[in-house]
Regions:
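N-terminal cationic and glycine-rich segments that engage phosphates or anionic surfaces
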Residues: 1-432
Length: 432
């Protein structure tokens, strides 16, 4: 492993990519420490602590923003507006034929237009979420008294939140283009990991104070370790369909005749279903939390609280839905079957064309179901334990199954991206 890092560092182009990625991450963390003007940050921190919001949907937002949400910094909204915009645009690409054609047939130009629409949507959603956050702070007297009713202060706060979310989106795009890995995923990874030390300290303090049994904490960390091993194994798992290429003569040379396989990953959509399911499941509870008279309403406490069974069921079904949704976007059986047919390939036992695509679709449905259930079970297990025991600490928002899946998944994706860069230069990678 150390030799691999040394090899990566020796490659000038790769070294520049790594340094650029680290620089963007540093800028992001610095932005997380810059407070928005006119906000009473101490009162806001006390409100989050006293209200127990660290174990609610807003606490989840706080984890995904690296603690910026509870401190009302310029990056408080984090990547939430971008995630929500991506969900909306990709759903519209299925519902609106013009957008679907643009996505599938537009080539690079079409992808650029879709990306541009997503950017504008991110800004619009950022404005809405910034306004909602401002209203929450105003309703709970978390804005400095001298500026509580000041229109100018409201405009500055909302625009600062919106600009911060747009800047995060831009930083993520820069990492994707000039750095290593997917920029948005890396920003999310950094945000979650940044909260781990605070979570560990809080849990150790709970043990010292007698609020949590030491053996429960040990079991939690052993479970987290086993979960990491399981995630690594499943992320590498794939179903390989045998493919045979028929022989063909071109001029005086004979081509084809070799056997290969078509790899289909079990967890094809990665961590995206969980990220998107969180955003959708959190939307109603977020609206309720931002309106004081709704915060203790029946729907908030009995349906959209993370420790209630209705929320767990909704969250489970959303992960299943987005797993299938993204598998259909990333892997098209008809397109794969047509490409095999054009190149003289076929799956033994199935005729080229429609029979092949139907078989691939059948296999895809099976492995997607397994991957979806795997993601769902890991994500909701801490919530089920909490719902049964009524111990909110066991929801493990910052060290729970959801966060571990995201962190390990992004880490593996980034390592593979770095390995691909190294293999292009004839060096052994991390996973070799």
């Amino acid at each position: 492993m150390l030799q691999t890092f040394r090899n990566a560092w020796r490659i000038e182009e790769l070294r520049k990519k790594i340094l650029f990625t680290l620089l963007i991450v540093l800028l992001y963390r610095l932005g997380n420490a810059v407070p928005v003007p006119f906000v009473d940050t101490k009162a806001l921190a006390d409100y989050f602590q006293a209200s127990g919001l660290q174990n609610t949907i807003l606490g989840l937002f706080n984890v995904m923003s690296g603690g910026a949400f509870s401190q009302a910094t310029i990056f408080a909204l984090s990547i939430q507006p971008y995630i929500n915009a991506s969900i909306i645009i990709q759903l519209l690409c299925i519902a609106i034929p013009a957008l679907e054609r643009l996505q599938k047939e537009g080539g690079e130009e079409g992808k650029k237009k879709i990306a541009s629409i997503t950017r504008y949507s991110t800004v619009a959603i950022g404005l809405l979420q910034g306004f909602a956050y401002y209203m929450m702070m105003r309703n709970y007297s978390l804005i400095n008294a001298d500026f509580a009713s000041n229109v100018w202060a409201a405009i500055v706060i909302i625009l600062t939140f919106t600009s911060g979310s747009a800047l995060i989106m831009w930083l993520g795009e820069q990492i994707t283009e000039f750095g290593i890995g997917n920029g948005i995923s890396i920003i999310l990874f950094v945000s979650i990991v940044a909260r781990f030390p605070n979570s560990i300290i809080r849990q150790v303090n709970n043990v010292v104070n007698g609020d949590l049994a030491w053996w429960v904490l040990v079991l939690m960390y052993l479970g987290a370790l086993l979960l990491i091993v399981l995630i690594v194994l499943v992320n590498d798992a794939e179903r390989r369909l045998p493919v045979q290429y028929s022989k063909r003569v071109v001029g005086r040379k004979m081509y084809g005749g070799q056997s290969t396989h078509l790899p289909m990953k079990v967890n094809m959509s990665g961590v995206l279903p969980i990220i998107f399911a969180q955003s959708i499941a959190a939307l109603p509870a977020t609206i309720c939390a931002f309106v004081p008279k709704w915060q203790n309403s029946w729907i908030m406490t009995h349906v959209f609280d993370t420790t209630t069974w209705p929320y767990i069921v909704i969250y489970f079904l959303l992960i299943i839905f987005f797993s299938y949704f993204y598998s259909t976007i990333q892997f098209n059986p008809i397109e794969v079957a047509n490409n095999l047919k054009k190149n003289g390939g076929f799956i033994p036992g199935f005729r080229a064309g429609k029979p092949t695509s139907e078989f691939i679709q059948k296999v895809l449905n099976k492995i997607t179901l397994f991957g979806a259930i795997y993601l769902s079970v890991i994500a909701i297990t801490p919530l089920i334990i909490s719902a049964c025991s009524k111990a909110e600490e066991l929801t493990g928002i910052s060290l729970g199954g959801t966060s571990i899946i995201i962190v390990v998944g992004v880490a593996l994706e980034t390592v593979r991206a770095l390995e691909a860069q190294m293999l292009m230069r004839n060096y052994k990678g991390f996973l070799s």
